[in-house]
Amino acid sequence: MIPTATYRLQFRNGMTFDRAAALVPYLKNLGISHLYASPIFTATKASTHGYDVTDANEIEPSIGGREGFERLVAELKAQGLGLIIDIVPNHMASSLENAWWRDVLEYGKESRYARHFDIDWSRRLTLPFLGDTFDAVLENGEIAIKPDPATGKPAFAYYDNYYPLAPATWQGREAEILALTDKAAIADLHERQPWKLMSWRDAARSLSYRRFFEVTGLVGMRVEDKTVFDDTHRLILELVRTGAVDGLRIDHIDGLADPKAYLARLRQEVGPACYITVEKILAKGEQLPDDWPVSGTTGYEFIASLAEVLVDDEQIDNLRQAYETVKGAPVDMRAELRAAKLLMVDRNFEGEFTRLLALALSIASELQIAQEESVVRQALRELLIAFPVYRTYGTAEGLPPTDICLLHRIVERVKTLETPPQPEALTFLSRLLTGDVPASSQEEATQFRVRFQQLTGPLMAKSVEDTLFFRQNMGLALNEVGAEPVTHHFSIERFHHEMKTRQARQPDALSGTSTHDTKRGEDARARLYTLTEAPEQWSECLARWRQMNQTHVKFLNDGTAPKSADTWMLYQALTGVWPPVLQPQDETGLNALKTRFEAFVEKALREAKLRTDWVDSNEAYETAMLDYARYLLAPDNQTFLQDFYRSLQPFIRAGLVNSLTQTVIKLTAPGVPDIYQGSEALNFSLVDPDNRREPDFATLAQQLDQLTPGVFSREESWLNGQVNQYVTAALLRLRQQNHELFRFGDYIPLRAVGQRADKVIAYARVNHDDALIVVAPRLVFAECDGLLSQSHSGFWSGTDIIIPGQLNQHRYRNVLTKERLMPGERLSLASHQGGVLVLMSD
């Protein structure tokens, strides 16, 4: 069954199955068809998100276990709602809490699970969980031989962790082993284990297993092996087959060795009715492979499409110039992207790159092709850096035709570099990737292809989303998962084109605007888009605020903190997160915001990897930056706070109009709208873990029944999210009543004419005799200096929407105001408050 709308709920951190069951009546009333659950399987005890699974065949006891899950399912079914769960086939926790992993540690290559995990068994399994080298930790007395409290067997004890010994190294002399205190003897015992403990700092260069991105605590799984697939999906398949679960969201599909084969096997097991979406980041213009048996993506590309509507393309260059003036230098985003990718290849993914290089050189040697290591290294490095998408989808048979064309374009681009790699090396690597090698080397070439494809995705994610987007802060709203790193022109025409393509290619994909992974909540993003409409006003504000807080800038050995570019980021981030109802005198509210903002600032600085890093933190710099950030929100900093609050008002109001437009589009454009918990009202969250905070469900449920069209005329209803919640509920119910229109209806752009024609977006959805007309405002910052609740009919005077022949014969009902009208050939906006119209044909 294809959902009409999903509601993402984050379990753990207090959210249990029973608490979720209590929310089901609210979700039904809101108009949701399917609850969309974060991972529910047993994860590490400290897990806050559930992606660090320790047992894929057990439901997490701390959130209610199997019995609690069954109660939730029963309540969902009683209310007529379905359930979608988030599954994680790519990885599990490399934790001692994981019985399979623990078995591998104890028995090494002889473990029944040795091939479940993606481990390089040509060497000892590396465990990068020490604070220093093994020798240093041993010398400091931090490690010893003790009985494991859980099993009683001898183990290497490091604080609260007990690493099991291989049976052959202790059985028959248990007392002797437990009595070991001599450091040389302990070191010798360590050398005889199938694993080796090492410093976490050495993971990037020495890890012997595939990890999720840079997270050593998450080990890759070999689900391409049927045994591994069966073992990791036993409970998942049971839940689908028994009808408890109606859909699956596949986490990090690009991490798998063969996504297509995995999805084909999964589809065969769950049947045609199961709704399947994949977490897949698509570049602009990129589409999912046609032969994947899924309904579509989880929708990050939809966020990027919305920017086409809400960014002022005519003024964004002025914002860019202002940013470069503050920064003190022009920004070459292509060069910045290259620098970020170089850092990832050379440092953060050094081990993965080295393994890939060694594999290529081994194949060259087998084929007796003369290739110098330095030459192949440069060619491989440049290919990885030049990759414009997350990955290709080659198999043992080679690359599909579209990916071969992509590879050829990349190679040609690499050849134009100022210092290009040798053509022979590029040709050799291309042959490995396309499978153009003798039969004797096909297996190794396939392995190279798989490893290459499993590296390009993490490389792209960590260099763009988690480095570049924290370094270059011209427009934080554009620094989002799924966004293009190199700024392009924005246009409604492109948005219309992308929606037509979406309707044709993946009409059942999720359309998300906030997730647990987005860099900021959808309404923070909507507000920050308005900076592109008023770059001069923003620049004047920034200069004034910097001057007000200048005395809190510190002078350090490596420069000032914050630097001018840092302040651009800080004030813009604060602009995005500031709650609309927060007053400068509200000390409690300021302190709550300060706690959230501090955590964001620390993460933003470390992700940028410029003056501090997760690997080597710069304490002096971080302290200075955090002190500055705290002062911004200090209750006694009233001169700044009053000015900030006053200056923010037009941005807040224009942002709320953007929020409404964004909501209307999400609920009426092609795709299945996904509501992230609490986002039916307003979501001004920062990057995780801030975006995983639980919303006030009690208030949301209580106010829903009280909402009427009158919310548009109450200023407080705009500021507290009631307008968005009312519109969300009204349109979700409309979707339920007109499922086929929204699923199959054509997407038809409508033309605006008149004085404010560039200030609206308009389109229709048409399926047989059913028609929907949607009109929403955009780029109205200049009109938002007054109250949102005021009528702005004068602003829209003389602006009409041209209604084509197949639509202008209908009578329509305004879904948001309940009025009825027959627009004819021209729909005048002057008589409709705010320019927001959702008209459903009678």
Residue spans for each PLM region:
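Hydrophobic or amphipathic alpha-helical targeting/insertion segments
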Residues: 72-119
